[in-house]
Each structure stands twice: as structure tokens, then as C-alpha cells.
């Protein structure tokens, strides 16, 4: 990541913290219980926008991509989704809907690569999600998003 890109990333993280942290507090749900709320059944596959629907991760299983995705996850995603991806991060506590449980071995395989790319790119501040998940598509390259998808896939296996 270059200088200007790093500045935008830091600014985005600060902005996300400013939005998410005030919403933190004791939650009514256990961590990760909102996977279905965060990813409504009707959202996959029919509601995935056409430009994302048929995408397939070109970096699937690539150890270098997984390692890079792990680093990006630690800095961008773990505050809400938790260090292991269980939806139990400190910034996600008390948020409605709670961050999705990326370790759910029953649910995650049902989500297409295109769906994950879409959610990372566009975030979740729209129907049917209405979540606080930020849109990372303006800060991350296509490759960086695929690296995240590659790493996220390892969390439920």
C-alpha cells in the first residue's frame, strides 16, 4: 500500500471507529448469532448484484493470498468480526445486526465468492442488511479483496 492509500485506509478506520464504537454496549445476542440477520437467506444467491454474482476467487487456496488476507483481516475486520472471525470483536458488541460469524461451517460454504466479494466491496448499509459494515471497495484493490476472501474461507474450515 502506498502513502496516499495508507492515509485513506487510516482515515477509513478512524471513521469506522467513530461510527461503530458509540453503538458498542451489552448486546442481546450471543456473538455470531446474527449471521442470518447479517446475511439474510434471500440475499444469496438471488439478491447478489449481477456484476458480482458469477465471480470466482482467482486466488482461492493460494498460500500467499491467504497470508496477505490474514494481515488485512487483522487490521480491517477483526475489530468487529473478532480475531478468529466468530463475530465477537469488541467494536461489534451491541451492534444490531451483530457482525456475521465467519467461522460458521454450515453457513459459510453456502456463500459464493461473488457474495463475499460484494459484501466486502459494498459493505452493508443497505437493505436487506442495514448493518454498519463499511464499504472497502474504494480502499482496497480487487486483488486485496480476493486475498480477504481467501483468508475468510479458512476461518470456517
Task: Give residue ranges: language-model regions.
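Extracytoplasmic electron-transfer domains, predominantly the class I c-type cytochrome c fold
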Residues: 96-152
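Periplasmic/extracellular electron-transfer cofactor-ligation site
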Residues: 27-29, 44, 48-51, 70-97, ...
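Alpha-helical transmembrane segments
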Residues: 14-18
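Bacterial Sec signal peptide processing site at the extreme N-terminus
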Residues: 25-39
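Residues at secondary-structure transition points
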Residues: 60, 64-67, 93, 107, ...
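C-terminal motif of bacterial Sec signal peptides marking the signal peptidase cleavage site
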Residues: 21-23
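Electrostatic cytochrome c docking/interface patches
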Residues: 36-72
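Bacterial N-terminal signal peptides that target proteins for export
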Residues: 2-11
Amino acid at each position: 500500500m502506498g502513502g496516499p492509500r495508507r492515509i485513506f485506509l487510516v482515515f477509513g478506520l478512524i471513521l469506522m471507529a467513530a461510527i461503530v464504537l458509540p453503538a458498542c454496549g451489552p448486546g442481546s445476542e450471543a456473538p455470531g448469532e446474527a449471521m442470518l440477520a447479517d446475511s439474510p437467506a434471500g440475499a444469496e444467491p438471488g439478491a447478489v448484484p449481477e456484476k458480482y454474482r458469477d465471480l470466482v476467487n482467482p486466488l482461492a487456496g493460494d498460500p500467499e493470498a491467504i497470508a496477505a488476507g490474514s494481515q488485512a483481516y487483522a487490521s480491517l475486520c477483526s475489530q468487529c468480526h473478532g480475531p478468529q472471525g466468530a463475530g465477537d470483536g469488541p467494536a461489534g458488541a451491541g451492534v444490531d445486526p451483530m457482525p456475521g460469524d465467519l467461522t460458521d461451517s454450515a453457513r459459510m460454504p453456502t456463500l459464493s465468492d461473488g457474495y463475499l466479494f460484494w459484501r466486502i466491496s459494498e459493505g452493508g448499509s443497505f437493505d436487506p442488511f442495514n448493518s454498519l459494515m463499511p464499504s472497502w471497495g474504494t480502499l482496497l484493490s480487487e486483488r486485496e479483496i480476493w486475498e480477504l476472501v481467501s483468508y475468510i474461507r479458512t476461518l470456517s474450515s
